[in-house]
């Protein structure tokens, strides 16, 4: 999940320590990352076209939260699909290949008639993006392109990140329920579908997992429970979702997470 770093600098000057107490510290300026995060956090309550455009213009695939933001932005593209041309114009980023690639990817994932047309247009007139994205106009779309497949039950770590982005953009209870299903499943998928934008190097790293451990399931459960501890309103949403689920799911949710080996020698690459 996401986090923020707060930096505070203070310089005090007084006549004497006995005569004058230190003045209150001036409020620190928010960092750019914190301002971006505040915009993301407040979007679900104010899903306006203007806020959507600001968020869409923020992110790139090179960002450390890039996959989270892809899920987030794919959802807001869906919300404003009727006004997509205006949204993309407001988002800007014409001089940034990274942002154009990010927008193109999000349009594919959103999978609406308007967003598919926008993605095809970007690819047709932007040879740099065509080369980066490894998609050529007129070829079939990648197999893994729809938000429903990201959010129905995340099967890869990057899909889980994207699903969290889609949830934070909408606060949809069905997505939260999918995290609970993922966190309580009794077996990992035999052949999880792969995200087309994941590089071979990223996939090789993600394939390393301890024997018998469904790391995505663990991550889903840990991330929900961690947020619930810090956010009472979110905790209430979790309980509302759990109350609709079978007793065995509720019991597995209450069970402690298994120990996760810390020694890399205990990791065994999963078969492709």
Predicted regions and their residues:
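Bacterial N-terminal signal peptides
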Residues: 4-14
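Non-catalytic all-alpha helical scaffold/repeat segments
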Residues: 19-272
